[in-house]
Amino acid sequence: MKGATKKMAYQEEQMKDLIANMVNNIQIQALHLDLILSGGAFNAIYLVGCLYFFREMESKDKIIIHRISTCSASSFVALFYLTNNLELFETKVYNMIVRNFKQNKKYIFSDEDIISVFNLIETTLYDVNGLTEYEILKKVNYKLYITYFDIKKCKRVVKKKYRSLHDIFETIKKSAHIPFITMNCMLYRNRYMDGWQPFIFTGTNERKQLFIDLLGRDKIKDCIVLKNHNKKNMDKIINGIHDAYSFFYQDGKYETAMCCYISDYGVASSIKYYSLYAFSYMLCIFLYLYVFFFQIPSHNIMNIYFIRVSLEFVKNAFYHFIEYYCL
């Protein structure tokens, strides 16, 4: 056990040295940025690599990050970035999430699992980091933008101001809830669903908006396939570091597999973003009709029965896919 811990510590030091040397090769200074982080389920581990690199860039005043727009898993990671706890996500939280998924087989979190994860985060922020709630909110408010759907209002919500740490946690849970996958229920608190796509900042702000895409063609499979995940975690983190380095080494002039300025978005990237955006709204409307309309007893019982049977069939088929292909 001690040997494994020493090896991990050695790898961490090597990675820090690697990142520091790479950042020294970047010839930019005080570049003001807003980050837009896509969702991507278990691909969040790639994002950790990117953010390790950005953290070093910020520490050397090469970039200044003002706001981070997120949805789904990226809201988790962004909270760790803003509170300087990326290592906690890499070494503990991510592995807890993967272990829960493998144990539950059909969904990621039981009620007990999700309580354990957020208790760990809370304990780290308060007891290990010594932060007060006021200090946490100061780091997060108007900097962390989280997108989710309110199905009852059939509305996409972007939240940027939080009343408490509990409010931050609840917003992340809303944004990360993929029906029947995150937890064994259709909607979080019978009302909320994954945001699917992060909010793109609007207005005439002169800051560059850097989009980090976790759902590229080379990564789409990794968002849910977890076989041999332990062997690949460090590879994915290094991949994220290298992608961010490649982007800034070329002065952001060329799109990489993950990084692209919104102002330089190509046709294919725009189509992908807005296709998923449109799909999320269609899913929102469908769930609204099912939960708040078709469930009313006065409607034709055969229509209700058909919809329920169809949903159950799709859910079971997807569970079998997860169990035999992903885990």
What are these language model-derived features?
Residues 2-68, 79-327:
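Patatin-like phospholipase
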Residues 70, 74:
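Gly/Ala-rich beta-loop-alpha elbow adjacent to hydrolase catalytic centers
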